[in-house]
Structures are given as C-alpha cells and as structure tokens.
C-alpha cells in the first residue's frame, strides 16, 4: 500500500510539472496577460495621438483658417496691411520706468 501511494504521488507530481513550469504553464499565461494589458495601454495612447493628428490633417485640408492660425502662431507671419505689436515683459527686479509724457521730457 505504501508503494502504491508513493507511485500516485510521483505520478501527480509528473502531471503537475507541465501545468506550472512547462511550455503552456500558468506562469507563462499570467506573464503574457500582463504584457497584453501593458500593450493595450500603449495602443490606447498611440490611438489618441493618431486621432489628434488625423483631425489636424483634416482641418488643414479643409480650409485656410487652420493654415493661417499656424502661420501666425508658429511662424510669426502677419497679413498684408496688418500692424504687428510686440509687448515685451519687464525683466524681474527692474523698476518700472514712467512714460515720457509724465517725466516732462518731450
């Protein structure tokens, strides 16, 4: 009887080996599931970026408003007969100088 129990334990151990450590083991399945979750997150980020770029391309193809906006903001272009005003912020630590009309200088 003792020999039969030992044989059954050895047989169960041999049957359990592929389940836990073999090619299609639970550990490998768990690892692959973790990789799938991570890849789905990356794919979602890339899809969002692609959708944004696609919308931008469609906008640029449809009208001149997007092209004009880009030319103004990124290239600093202005339309003909427009006047460009540039406001320069004061450097920190410098006192504000009064306008020339207030100081008496003309």
UniProtKB/Swiss-Prot annotation:
Subcellular compartments: Cell inner membrane
UniProt KW Cell division keyword: yes
Topological region Cytoplasmic: 1-3
Designated name of the protein: Cell division protein FtsB
GO cellular component, one term: plasma membrane
Record's function text: Essential cell division protein. May link together the upstream cell division proteins, which are predominantly cytoplasmic, with the downstream cell division proteins, which are predominantly periplasmic.
A matching Pfam family: DivIC
Origin species: Methylobacillus flagellatus (strain ATCC 51484 / DSM 6875 / VKM B-1610 / KT)
Keyword Transferase attributed: no
Topology versus the membrane: Single-pass type II membrane protein
Transmembrane segment boundaries: 4-21
Lineage of origin: Bacteria, Pseudomonadati, Pseudomonadota, Betaproteobacteria, Nitrosomonadales
Residue ranges the record marks as coiled coil: 31-73
């Amino acid at each position: 009887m003792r020999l039969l129990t030992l044989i059954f334990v050895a047989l169960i151990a041999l049957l359990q080996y592929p389940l836990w450590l073999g090619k299609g083991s639970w550990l490998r399945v768990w690892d692959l599931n973790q990789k799938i979750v991570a890849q789905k997150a990356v794919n979602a980020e890339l899809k969002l970026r692609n959708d944004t770029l696609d919308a931008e391309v469609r906008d640029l193809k449809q009208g001149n408003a997007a092209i004009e906006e880009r030319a103004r903001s990124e290239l600093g272009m202005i339309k003909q007969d427009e006047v460009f005003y540039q406001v320069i912020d004061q450097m920190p630590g410098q006192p504000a100088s009064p306008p020339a009309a207030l100081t008496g200088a003309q």
